[in-house]
A protein has these predicted regions:
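Electropositive phosphate-/nucleotide-binding environments in soluble metabolic enzymes
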Residues: 24-31, 59, 88, 141-148, ...
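Conserved catalytic cysteine-centered active-site region
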Residues: 4, 54-109, 113-146, 184-210, ...
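Beta-strand segments within the central parallel beta-sheet cores of soluble alpha/beta enzyme folds
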Residues: 45-54, 76-79, 106-111, 163-170, ...
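Short glycine/threonine-rich loop-to-helix capping motif typified by GTGT followed
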Residues: 57-68, 246-252, 290-313, 376-383
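Active-site-proximal alpha-helical scaffold in enzymes
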Residues: 81-112, 144-178, 218-224, 337-357
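Short acidic, glycine/serine/threonine-rich loops at helix termini
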Residues: 22-23, 117-122, 177-181, 247-250, ...
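Condensing-enzyme catalytic core mediating Claisen C-C bond formation in acyl metabolism
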Residues: 1-24, 167, 199-263, 267, ...
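Conserved active-site "lid/cap" helical segment
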Residues: 1-85, 93, 154-161, 183-189, ...
Length: 385
């Protein structure tokens, strides 16, 4: 179990514009976000000595970004081949790297041209490799297809409705309307949600995250060092990564999953709350990995904000609204702000805790939850001021 409570902190954040057509390389986007994070922390580039990135073969490695930025002291580099499930894990890894003495100031970044470049589930080779050889020949080629099956299971088992999924989409859009960097700011009603075109049953267009070009970066350092830097430190209080007994994505792995009415979070929630010494009721807000509306329901249930099967009524009650008992995805989430594979959730959480969120600021926010991942494995952290 991660046991470095409050020893490390987020000292800087950076991000590019989020667009559909960046007209730039992923290296250029990453470099901009990383340089902004360095400047935000009040550091010089030569003080950064660690870089961790994650990608799915669609971006540049950390060493390329280190070269682009001219970092002379990059002693530790790690490129994690994974998706949104590690959007928090990379920062937990940064704390372990610093604890081990391998680096002092570690940049974590994700850069992607997810709309204009390599699109998840987009064009592919005529041959199937890896786990896709068990799925692609049967027409299962995209994440919406997989998650739709899981969602339908929850609907069948607990009576979850499309209107409840729509409540999540509408809430995200309302929050995004107050976010200058959000890609989708136009107000949306529940009627608009139901009018959006079907994609894969039971999902409509507004149940599925955006495709985005952009980059985000987060700088992690020791809490003692962070207190001497430019910004108010945001302490990493608790963290966890993991999943259940079957963490792959082939048909065989999916069929082994105990019950798609829940995902990875029931398996890591206890470790998270124990590592933080806190519980769900202590959170002022939550930034939930929402690649789909349904993933929000699974995370809220799995993390203990409501019981399994009660996520639909919970979101429909207004609890997740900005003025609710647990404001969720205050920036608009992956559904309305942008899809930078989840790292933009940490950007928003840090801004909330610094009191820099403007019109969408959660009153007196001092502690929050960030989750990453939607299916069989994921990560999460509690951060505070």
């Amino acid at each position: 179990m991660w046991n470095l409570r409050d020893k490390y902190a987020i000292a800087g954040i950076g991000y590019t514009d989020f667009t559909k057509q960046s007209g730039r390389t992923t290296r250029s986007l990453a470099s901009e976000a990383c340089l902004k994070a360095i400047n935000d922390a009040g550091l010089d580039a030569d003080e950064v000595d660690g870089i961790i990135s994650y990608n799915m073969g669609d971006s540049d490695p950390g060493i390329a970004v280190a070269t682009e930025l001219g970092l002379p002291r990059a002693h530790y580099m790690n490129d994690v081949f994974a998706g949104g499930n590690v959007a928090v894990m990379v920062m937990l890894t940064a704390t372990a790297v610093i604890e081990a003495g391998l680096a002092k100031n570690v940049l974590c970044f994700r850069s992607m041209n997810g709309r204009s470049g390599v699109r998840l589930g987009g064009s592919r080779d005529q041959n199937a490799y890896g786990f896709s050889q068990y799925t692609a020949p049967f027409g299962w080629m995209t994440y919406p297809q997989a998650m739709a099956m899981w969602c339908r299971r929850h609907m069948s088992k607990y009576g979850t409705t499309s209107a409840q999924l729509g409540a999540i989409a509408v809430n995200c859009r309302k929050n995004a309307s107050m976010n200058p960097r959000a890609m989708q700011r136009k107000p949306m009603t529940l009627d608009d949600y139901f009018a959006s075109r079907p994609i894969v049953d039971p999902f409509r267009m507004y149940d599925i995250c955006l495709e985005s070009d952009g980059a985000c970066a987060v700088l992690v350092t020791s809490s003692a060092h962070a207190r001497d830097l430019k910004q108010k430190p945001v302490y990493i209080t608790g963290g966890a990564y993991g999943g259940g007994p079957s963490q792959g994505f082939s048909f065989e792995d999916i069929m082994r999953w105990p019950d798609p009415a829940h995902n990875c979070f029931p398996y890591i929630a206890d470790d998270l709350w124990k590592s933080a010494g806190l519980g769900p009721k202590d959170m002022d807000f939550a930034e939930i990995y929402d690649c789909f509306t349904y993933s929000t329901i699974m995370a809220l249930e799995g993390m203990g904000f409501c019981k399994e099967g009660e996520g639909g009524p919970y979101v429909e009650s207004g609890a997740i609204a900005l003025a609710g008992s647990l404001p969720v995805n205050t920036h608009g989430g992956l559904l309305s702000e942008a899809y930078i594979h989840g790292l933009n959730h940490t950007i928003e959480a840090v801004e909330q805790l610094r009191g820099q969120a403007g019109e969408r600021q959660v009153a007196n926010a001092s502690i929050g939850l960030v989750t990453a991942g939607a299916m069989s494995c994921g990560s999460a952290m509690v951060i505070r001021t």
